[in-house]
Amino acid sequence: MKKKYTVFLILAFISWKFISAQVVTIHVDASQGRKAISPYIYGKNNNISDDPGSPTTAAEWKLMREAGLRFTRENGGNNATKYNWRLKLSSHPDWYNNVYAHNWDYAAKMLSDSMPGVQGMWAFQLIGKAASNTSHNFNDYAYNGSTWWSGVCQNLAGGGVANAAGTCTATTNGNPNLYLENWTADSTVGILDHWFGTGGLNYNQNNIRYWSMDNEPDIWNSTHDDVMPAQPAAEAFMQLYFAAAKKARAKFPNIKLCGPVPA
């Protein structure tokens, strides 16, 4: 009897191996059950130069076209939070809070001219401050030849004193009132009139429908601690959000507001 069981088990094992070794062919008819998906599901971040003196190259435009790019986020991330569209300036929290030129008008025009139909996303500023001038930048070139080091996050614009030991704690913080100005909900949504309104630049709002509601507000007390040393309560931030959102939608009913954008 024991031999019979052994033979049975061997035959069963051989049969299982034979069955499991069979090739299974699955045919998929890709023409069936197809559903449209948004062309904006795929995108890239910060691709278009906003500096007329250093434009996006022909090779870069060619690469984006060949990749099938349909959506590009162009607000500059951390540098979006204090962008002043009137003066075309922004404060750089990852580089001493220094203020440098950025021209969103130029970037939006180049995107529209070079890749018609591609959606470009810019941003509204909700923190309440925007860059006002370049006169109070920390002289990073004189300090160390503009070399990156662990202290680039120190708040040195506005007359600060560098802490040579590094880290993000300056010996003396700069005065943000020297390089920033107040920036209300009316101020930030005014770019919609500038781009789309009567007497404005007459940009195609259908290709600039998506707007980021600032950038990473959950870490403002780190990236923008010059004006927000304590993290705002969620309710306080949402009131800033709602104030700008209502004014933006009143000017541009078909606008698509995105965010809050978390870190």
State the predicted function of each range.
Residues 1-22:
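Bacterial Sec-dependent N-terminal signal peptides
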